[in-house]
């Protein structure tokens, strides 16, 4: 599940990724524009998976890869002109049960938005490249640990070829 915006608007009509609710997304547009004006880089999760039932997992499962791809094309086109975003796929859990859906979404965004970088955020003790490291759409590694940070970052930098790595979540 997911929360409405502060005005009570849900992101999608009828829990359908392919039916964006324009008032919700107009609010997102205003927030993104203001963040850009202030010089913020936004880490944008187009479909936050959630630590438990607080994310989009059920919605992605219901949609399946074809509808996730359609949503990815839509959101990628909508925000490709912005200069201040980094796409972050996943969020607080491993994507095993929605791996094909996450892949379809990410590849679709990349198809229409070649300028922005992509990373992913999985469960504690993992890095983005642990799941999709060999796929062309994943540009930047991110590490998530509540353990020793230096060890995790050094381990994650050992990939071939080496790619940039940053700490996305810790204590």
What do these predicted regions represent?
Residues 109-119, 160-171:
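Short beta-strand/loop segments at the ligand-binding rim of alpha/beta enzyme cores
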Residues 1-151:
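Active-site mouth of glycoside hydrolases
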